[in-house]
Amino acid sequence: MPHYTGPLLTRDSADTLRRAHDKGAADWQGSLDLGRSQDTVALDADGFHFRGQAYPWPGKLKDRTLYYWDGEDFAPISRYSGSLIKLVPTEWGAPTFEIDGIKMLPTSKLSPFEDARRKVELVAPAGKIILDTCGGLGYFAACALEAGVGQIRSFEKNADVMWLRTLNPWSPDPDSASAGGRLQFSHGDVSQQIEQVASNSVDAILHDPPRFGIAGELYSQTFYDHLARVIRKGGRLFHYTGAPNKLTSGRDVPREVAKRLEKAGFKAELALDGVLAVKR
């Protein structure tokens, strides 16, 4: 799917453009792609010009919502297919996303992109073949590509999340020159697709599943046994667990995960907000 290259608006950025025009400015300099680049945007009574194309002034925009040009109007980047999936702006530039109002990436202390970079560094991706089990917005894959990964194979179960990626300038484009053919991105349920991955075929694994209550199969012993099967001896696995409240959940999910990974054939320890494991 081709990636969108038009303007992305928030209520704040649209208001900033309007104020600049109302003060008599003929143009405005800044970012309309969530901080990925800086542009000079021409302003007039009818709207603004971005990268050679004219756009009308948007109507009233909502807070905590990103808008893209759909060919006729500025539309929110959200879809409903049983669940409401939405791309959400952050103060850091790189957006997060929500499913039914539940934030899927941490953003309170640092950018979700920088958070992904810290985790990717744990598996030392340079030159390696990596399995990225739950692609999401692709921040693990993007950071691995930046770090010189040899090849990364990524799965995403939700077609609407894949659509979000095409509108997010922070998500990697498998067809881009910078990816260089190293990112293989597939629509599929990794709990099933893992059975087709050859044994001893990957050097490292990045596993960022939804929380246990949504995707328990991705925390199962059966799935961990498959991860142990496909990764080579000495290979590193980072498993995101988050830090669920033990008092309210009654469970210590990180330690449960570590115990199952040990049983599957890894040496596991708690790291960041998850578990780092090495195949024995």
Give short role names for the model-derived ranges:
Residues A126-L137:
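Conserved class I S-adenosyl-L-methionine
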Residues Y219-K233:
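A short glycine-rich, Lys/Arg-flanked "PGG" loop and its adjoining helix->strand segment in the class I
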Residues G234-G242:
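Conserved beta-strand signature within the Rossmann-like core of class I S-adenosyl-L-methionine
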Residues A243-R280:
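Class I S-adenosyl-L-methionine
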